[in-house]
Structure formats: structure tokens, C-alpha cells
Amino acid sequence: MECCGPGYSSTQEAIKAPNEKLLYTIAIYTGTGIQKPDYLATVDVDPESPTYSQVIHRLEMPGIGDELHHMGWNACSSCHDDSSMSRKFLILPGVRSNNLHIVDTATDPRAPRLHKIIDGAEIKGKADLSGPHTVHCLGSEIIISFLGNAKGEAPGGYLQLDKDFNIVGRWENSMGDIKFGYDFWYQPRHNIMVSSEWAAPNTFMPLSLIHI
């Protein structure tokens, strides 16, 4: 059953879909001593293409030391039935810089371009959060887990963005007994969200491998 929205209505439908022809992955320089910006690499995975298995584009971030981490789409399978939604943007958090990089993958999928940056200082000021980690969509909006508050202390929280990537504010009412932030996923039909724990930003920033 076809639909105009993003994603697929079920795992079975996703299995039937055509193979991807492009892959996006991040490349970072954290811990290498190399003072260059992290970048988003576009990889050609179409076996019929002359550039098959090659990195065909690199989108460098404007700054140095972001440590790009998990990334996510602006829209996902939860809006599969909404024809007004589409996967146009990737959100790339910098876990060290606290910046959120919004990347346009729709204009030219083979050469993504930077659409917007949400500065980490703005996030600290408006939402008291740092250490962005996991990106998931909530219908037309986006939620991002953070490992710490503006001072880098646990437990962090969740930042909500609108569809135009403006800061709405904190998504959660309370972190309750949660001691640390990390990854998460939600099941709207069951009215639950499951999160896991890792560490506060101050635990690993700064960090030297000689201390491990």
C-alpha cells in the first residue's frame, strides 16, 4: 500500500522497498590531533553507478571540534500518512560544541548543503541543556535528548524544535528519578517512551585517553 508520507507503514513494507542508492555518514577528527572540521560524507551505494562504493561528497561543518554524533531526520515513519511531510533535512548534533547542524539533503541528495545552525550557546540560554545526543521526530516537530544541563551536569533533558527548526523549549515536564540522559525511543500507540542512561558531559569533557 503506497502512501505519500515518509517512511513505511510497517517493517514488511520497508523490506519491499527499493535498495538505497546513497548513504550518509559522519566523519570526525576527535582524538586525532587533526584540526579540521568534522564532515558529513555521501557514499554512492548504487552497484550500477560508476562511482559505486566511493565517497562522492563531503560537507564540512563550519567549526572545529563538534564531534558529530547520532543524527536523525526531520520526519520519520510516524508521519507516514501525512503527505505534507517528507525527509528533507538531517539534524547533526555536535556533542562537544552543543551545536545542531541542519543539513538539506533534498535540493541535491548527492551534495547535501548546510541549511541552518542552532548555536549551542542559544540552546544553553533558552533550555539549559548541553551535550546533544539522539534525534527523533514527533509528527511535525523534533525532539533531541541531551546528556546534561548548561553546566554539563546530569541528568540533562529533551529539547523540542518546531518544523522550521526554532527552539520551542524543554519537551519533558520532569526528569523524575532519571539520573543520566542518553538514547530514547517512543511508542505513541502504547503512550510510553523508553530511555537509557550513559553519563553527564562533564564526565568525558575534557577527557584524556591516558586517564582510562
Give names to the regions the model predicted.
Residues T11-E13, V45, S49, T203-S208:
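Conserved small-residue
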Residues D66-H70, G94, H133, F180-D183, ...:
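His-enriched metal-coordination microenvironments in redox/metal-binding proteins
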Residues K16-N19, I26-H69, H80-M85, L92-D119, ...:
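Beta-propeller domains
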Residues E2-N19, L68-S86, D128-L138, W185-N191:
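Structural signature of eukaryotic scaffold interfaces centered on beta-propeller domains
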Residues T105-W185:
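Asp-box/WD-like beta-propeller blade repeats and closely related beta-sheet repeat scaffolds
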Residues N98-L100, K151-G152, Y158, N202:
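Structural signal for beta-propeller blades
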Residues I210-I212:
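Conserved small/polar residues in nucleotide/adenosyl-binding loops
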